[in-house]
Amino acid sequence: MPNNPQDKPTVLKDPRYLEVTYSTTRAPVGEYPAMLARHLMETAYKKTGKLLDIGSGRGDFLDAFSHLGYEVSGVDISPLSAAAADTYTLKTCNLECEPLPFNENEFDFIFSKSVIEHLHTPYNLVSGAYRVLKPGGVAVIMTPSWAHTYWGPFYIDHTHVTPYTIPSLADVLQIAGFENISSRYFYQLPWVWRHSSLLPIIRLFSALPLSYRPYENARWPDSFNKLIRFSKEVMLLAVCQKPSR
């Protein structure tokens, strides 16, 4: 049996992975990518520039950042992602073991959401992000919070293999050479971003024993299902910077 992660077969390379797991029926695009992109522009990036989406998938966030004025490129392990290359610069790469197919110091910003947990080791991704980021550039890494998902939701996607906590995600980035690292919990409920005083209520609500899709076959309306799900399935959001020259 292969001992190295790069030697192991992975379903992530199969076009059917995106078609099934992130089908527009199961995961409609909606307004969330645009709302998150704007939030990150205002709170993390602070300006526009060249942005690389590592693990760009269907291209939802490429569209969102492009509409805000960013010059976007994407990279993903799935050949289905590269099928949208007629719109954006999109390349395929095994993020587990291959170097990112971009030049050193090429991008002002890095964005990577729900990717690093799919990798057996994070260092190829984060060291690659460091290499292609310009000095002073900012990277945003998002991944499920193990503290909030260990009881089951982490494995809703069967390809999740490496969980993270606030300190472990920060350590990974520091080892790669990043500085000014902030790692924190992040609720995927846009109205909470604007009204942080509501967080205690959300935390109390999350403790209620309510089922939700897709973890269980609950029959709530979509809006209430999202409230239940994203009060419980909290993300980690790390913002860091490559040192200036």
What is the predicted role of each segment?
Residues 1-103, 109-113, 123-126, 186, ...:
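Conserved N-terminal segment of class I S-adenosyl-L-methionine
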Residues 72, 139-140:
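A short hydrophobic/small-residue beta-strand
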Residues 90-92, 140, 184-245:
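A C-terminal cap/extension of S-adenosyl-L-methionine-dependent methyltransferases
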Residues 141-162:
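Short, glycine-/aromatic-enriched active-site segment of Class I SAM-dependent methyltransferases
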Residues 162-176:
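Short alpha-helix
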